[in-house]
Amino acid sequence: MRTRQTARAAILSTLVVVAGAARASDLFNVNLAETGNPGNRLFVGSSSLPNLLENLADQTGAFASFNGVPFAANLTYAGIDNAIAIQYDPTGGANGGEVIRITSLLGSDATPTFDRANGDLGNQIRDFFLKDDPDAIKDFLKQVNRRSLVAVTDGNPLATTARSARYKFERFGIHTDFTTTEGELYNRFSVDHSARRARSPGANGGETPGAERAPLDNLPVHQAATPIRTRFHFAAQYIDAQSFDGYSFDLNTSFEYVFSEHVSAVLGFPVGYHAVEDADVFNGGVHIDVPVRFIIPDYGSPYGLTWQVTPGVSMDLSGSVDYAAGGVLWSGGVNNTFIFHLDRLRIVTSQQLTLHEGQKLKINDYEFDPGVSQQILKLGAKAAYSLTHKLEVYGGVTYTDFLKDSAIDHYWSPTAGFSFVFRNGANITVGYEGDFADDFERHGGRVGVTLPF
């Protein structure tokens, strides 16, 4: 008899382990045990925290077998074990009715109690996370950002802070040269550098050439562009973070007005969407930046230096009902970029610091407060080589460091591809982009289009 009981216990333990492994990739998991009978257990996973908690409180769906049964439950949130602890008592409420309590909430002292006498338990616990106590959820999300590799607003390459900093860095830093200035077009298309090199000192017995500041005979002049530059950048990437899979899409649009060769103003609208284990996250933003080029190459020279400094501000927002997370972030920062023009070779180095602060977001009855206060440092370099006047190849890498507490301290982002430059200032780029950190990888492609209007 004892042997059979031991065998049954072993089988039950095996099933529990298998069930847990089967749910390991779910973003949110509940480990449930009957009060006073810990052998009666249940594991349930979901891609939506509000739906999971609502079904748990009402004992519906996958929790139907625990209807009317007292239990204690621990919830894993986006890879964080025991982020939420819950107790249910079918007779502990007012007039002997049902009651459910949150006994532990990561980062918060809140221990709310939901009584059947006040309405449906599932609706009450759902509303707690989505709108009723934004201060408690703010403290909770602060800790999530510091521990989860796939948090919504901060602490990883998918987060709102990282997306905001990345837009600015790519647009005005490592890929700023994809928006070609008038002087760069002139030097690229309207000066015969091969003839110039042939007449350089040493090529003709030490003869010194005259100033080369106008197109040479029979050379087509580049087409002058309007003061408007419109730029689109689309990226699609696959996500592998810890035990989670997903995908992300970004479409960044910017409109630049060129006041002179030295000063422009840019209005940007980055938007993004990503899904992790079917949990949806939406991002958007409005950026205002002013690139100032203190140094530009001389007209007619294949060599020179561009020094550009770009201060800017932005409002970024994100939202995910599945995560019960999101909010509005204000940010400001400055990018410093040097471009070394070395005939066919172009080297870009860029440094950037941005500050990000959270602001409460209210949509209808829902309230989100991201609880974010972050600083992000980005350092990057890229080399581009012109195979022909219009075709070039490029490759580079960016280092990103979250200067305040975060789940991912830093990560690397390589990029490589081709760029097609046209005489009127239009540009098309196709390439690879990735992000690499401990237990986090993202791979994908980018397509960029710059239009001279």
Language model regions located:
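Short loop/turn motifs that connect adjacent beta-strands in outer-membrane beta-barrel proteins
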Residues: 218-229, 257-265, 296-307, 339-348, ...
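Residues that define the transmembrane beta-barrel architecture of outer-membrane proteins
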Residues: 228, 245-251, 280-288, 305, ...
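Transmembrane beta-strands of outer-membrane beta-barrel pores
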Residues: 236-240, 255-257, 271-277, 294-296, ...
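Outer membrane beta-barrel transmembrane domains
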Residues: 265, 275, 359-453
